A protein has these predicted regions:
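Active-site loop of short-chain dehydrogenase/reductase
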Residues: 6, 80-83, 97, 130-144, ...
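Conserved glycine-rich Rossmann-like NAD(P)H-binding loop of the short-chain dehydrogenase/reductase
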Residues: 28-43
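Rossmann-fold cofactor-recognition segment
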Residues: 48-62
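Conserved glycine-rich cofactor-binding loop
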Residues: 14-15
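Structural signature of the Rossmann-like NAD(P)-dependent dehydrogenase/reductase core
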Residues: 10-11, 88-89, 137-143, 186-191
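Catalytic loop of short-chain dehydrogenase/reductase
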Residues: 92, 99-105, 112, 137-180
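C-terminal helical subdomain
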Residues: 181, 185, 189-190, 201-242
């Protein structure tokens, strides 16, 4: 994948996996806009990374769309064309006691609005132009706890598990709708593993940099539609059942 005059948007980019993803894309020569919820943190992270930023709560779909439009207009004014890379690395964990029969409406809606609904908002706003231009990569951070072939069936953390299972289904469905890579548009989900982030905790076995590596690879890899695959769930550059 040539990175000449390419640009990306990374949600959740002010810390953790999103920050490391943005860092890797910048190292690959891609101009990046990060999105974070906290204004000061996003500003500080953007300064360290040497990129642009916007602050917004992605759970507010109206404001989130407005920010995505604003970023696109700003990028266009700087000479960029259609968005090349969209990485959706934002996310929240549901309350540890949120089993299906114990959780409440507020916790359910909070988790799904961020983990799943905001994925739809971003893709629905940005990906039509990418698909029409027959280009672009969308990478969505999912989780192994959302795998219905494995950990996702073990119960507990219901809003989180189900939101991530929804992400996996969303990616697969979108890939079929857009030609499974044959038209130049790629969409994939990743399981980063248990990483040392604010969500994962300091005792997690993997660093955020390790967790972000597959996302960076998917966003920048060369793709041959005759042999390579998209619309899948990946872990450490390997396809896993979803």
């Amino acid at each position: 994948m040539s990175d000449s005059k390419k640009w990306a948007i990374v949600t959740g980019g002010s810390r953790g996996l999103g920050y490391e993803t943005a860092k890797g894309l910048i190292a690959a020569g891609i101009s990046v806009y990060i999105i974070g919820k906290d204004e000061e943190r996003a500003k500080d992270s953007a300064k360290t990374l040497g990129c642009s930023y916007r602050a917004v709560d992605v759970a507010d779909s109206k404001k989130f769309r407005e920010v995505l439009i604003e970023i696109t207009q700003d990028a266009t004014s700087k000479g960029f064309e259609v968005l090349d890379v969209l990485v959706l690395a934002h996310g929240v964990m549901s309350d540890k006691m949120s089993k299906t029969l114990r959780t409440n409406d507020e916790e359910w809606r909070r988790t799904l609005s961020i983990n799943l609904d905001a994925v739809f908002t971003a893709v629905n706003q940005l990906a039509p132009a990418m698909a029409e231009a027959r280009k672009g990569r969308v990478v969505v951070y999912s989780a192994c706890l959302g795998r219905m072939s494995g950990p996702g069936t073990h119960g507990g953390l219901a809003p989180y598990r189900i939101s991530k299972a929804g992400v996996n289904a969303f990616v697969k469905n979108l890939s079929y709708e857009t030609g499974l890579g044959a038209r130049g548009f790629l969409v994939d989900a990743i399981c980063p593993g248990h990483c040392r982030t604010d969500m994962g905790g300091e005792d997690a076995p993997r660093s955020a940099q390790e967790g972000a590596e597959t996302a960076i690879w998917l966003a920048t890899r060369d793709f041959d539609a005759t042999k390579d695959k998209t619309g899948l769930l990946w872990e450490d550059r390997t396809v896993v059942d979803w």
